[in-house]
Amino acid sequence: MAKDTGRVKRRERKNITSGVAHVSASFNNTMVTITDAQGNAISWSSAGHMGFKGSRKSTPYAAQMAAEDAGKKAMEHGMKTIEVKVSGPGSGRESALRALQSVGFTITTIQDVTPIPHNGCRPPKRRRV
């Protein structure tokens, strides 16, 4: 087996002033990824990553905590303004957006990029509870 040299790869601190926040809110979880203009990920977080398990991941509070965590990580890289692209039908859409504002970002645009089929695949059957 190869011997470990002991070098640790350090993540260099980029100074990026503006970026894009991708909020993916599904019925089960909310994921927030903050990228630069080219699409390279700067920081990310999700409700599950913040320690919420099961049905608590789909709550607006869990989405708020995930957005705050991703926003604080991105602010360490010098980010100040963001565009927000929201996709999915989940309950964490608005709360994640408010959390990004409360961290201190200046939001320039808000865009809904939820994919809508033009009568594509058949949807799953209705739940009977």
Curated annotation (Swiss-Prot):
GO terms for molecular function: rRNA binding; structural constituent of ribosome. GO terms for biological process: translation. One of its GO terms (cellular component) is ribonucleoprotein complex. Keywords: Ribonucleoprotein, Ribosomal protein, RNA-binding, rRNA-binding. It comes from the Bacteria. SUPFAM superfamilies: Translational machinery components. InterPro entries: Ribosomal_uS11, Ribosomal_uS11_bac-type, Ribosomal_uS11_CS, Ribosomal_uS11_sf. Disulfide bonds: none annotated. Pfam families: Ribosomal_S11. Located on the platform of the 30S subunit, it bridges several disparate RNA helices of the 16S rRNA. Forms part of the Shine-Dalgarno cleft in the 70S ribosome. Part of the 30S ribosomal subunit. Interacts with proteins S7 and S18. Binds to IF-3. HAMAP family: Ribosomal_uS11. Belongs to the universal ribosomal protein uS11 family. This is Small ribosomal subunit protein uS11. It comes from Maricaulis maris (strain MCS10) (Caulobacter maris). The lineage of its organism: Bacteria, Pseudomonadati, Pseudomonadota, Alphaproteobacteria, Maricaulales. The gene is rpsK.
